[in-house]
């Protein structure tokens, strides 16, 4: 359907801009929030879609070394704010303080994956 193609092109655009702006953590947070907004707006009542959106949001933040918010905002549902926001910009403005209050991941303190899971058995065991 045409709607799917429009969302696909919008998400593709924001993904490409995200890659270009990886050096700027504020812009990464903004792009990640916009991708979350479009994801939630695309399938607002689909079971599990918000969970996937949160996974993408936090995955982008961690991959870009931006850290993640220490917890979800109290008494707020960010997915519903995305669904009900009139525009992506309005949504981003509303969640910007929450995203800025992030905790840096402790990833540098962890051993490299190939050292922590040196055998195929170890790697498969970690997935279970």
Enumerate the language-model features and the residues they cover.
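Phosphate/pyrophosphate-binding active-site loops
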Residues: 1-128
């Amino acid at each position: 359907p045409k709607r799917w193609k429009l969302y696909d092109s919008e998400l593709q655009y924001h993904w490409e801009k995200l890659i270009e702006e990886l050096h700027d953590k504020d812009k990464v947070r903004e792009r990640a929030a916009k991708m979350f907004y479009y994801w939630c707006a695309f399938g607002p009542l689909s079971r599990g879609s918000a969970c996937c959106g949160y996974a993408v949001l936090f995955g982008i933040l961690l991959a870009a070394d931006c850290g993640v918010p220490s917890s979800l905002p109290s008494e707020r549902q960010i997915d519903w704010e995305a669904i009900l926001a009139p525009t992506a910009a309005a949504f981003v403005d509303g969640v910007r303080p929450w995203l800025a209050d992030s905790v840096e991941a402790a990833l540098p303190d962890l051993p490299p994956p190939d050292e922590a899971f040196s055998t195929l058995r170890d790697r498969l065991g970690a997935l279970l």
